[in-house]
Amino acid sequence: FGRGGRGVYILTDIPDLDAMLSSKPSHVLSQKYFRDLLYAQDIFEDLIVMEELHPPYHSSYTLVQKEEVCTLDHIREWGSASQTFRGVVNYDKDIENFTKILAREYNLEYTFNIELATNSQGKLVLFDLNPRIGASSGIDKDLGVNYPYLSLKLLLGENIELIYKNILNRRFVRYLDYVWSD
């Protein structure tokens, strides 16, 4: 997970260069290689170093209306980073309560997206907070929650009313269609 635009790498003990170059996925680096790289630099950009996280990976989208939030959670089953091919959409009260706290603490008054994954103790850990909804939120329109449209309504100062807390274990599959061209 997390390669490409997110710039996330897993540091591990890899015995030599051949083992590193032949290892997959390619977002795994040896600790020695990374340490030597850092020591060789005079100036480098800020880094965030955190524990290794594991599936399930969650991407939750939130609309904020005054003191209330509307959050749906997407759990990735197949895919990587923002390219989730198959997943499950749920209303999760605990995650929604967490997003309510985030909205209050970080003064998030419109829309946002959080990414969560599981640490080695089995607890969900926040590893990304985006002050916007992601493009993937558009798939929820078929479940009655059209995030892009509702975001525009909020922007215009209109109230929104949603029935979404009954959305449980709704599986989606996407990007698997054929397009023919001459």
For each predicted feature, which ranges?
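A short catalytic or substrate-binding loop motif that flags glycine-/basic-rich loops and adjacent residues
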Residues: 1-2, 52-56, 107-110
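Conserved anion/nucleotide-ligand pocket segment
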Residues: 1-11
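A short, flexible beta-alpha/helix-coil linker loop
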Residues: 2-4, 78-82, 132-135
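Short, solvent-exposed loop/turn segments at secondary-structure boundaries
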Residues: 9-11, 86-87, 138-141
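A short beta-strand motif that forms part of the nucleic acid-binding face
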Residues: 12, 75-77, 130-131
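Short, charged/polar, Gly/Pro-enriched secondary-structure boundary elements
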Residues: 17-18, 134
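Phosphate-binding site of ATP-dependent enzymes
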Residues: 21-97, 117-125
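ATP-dependent carboxylate activation and anion-phosphoryl transfer catalytic cores
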Residues: 91-182
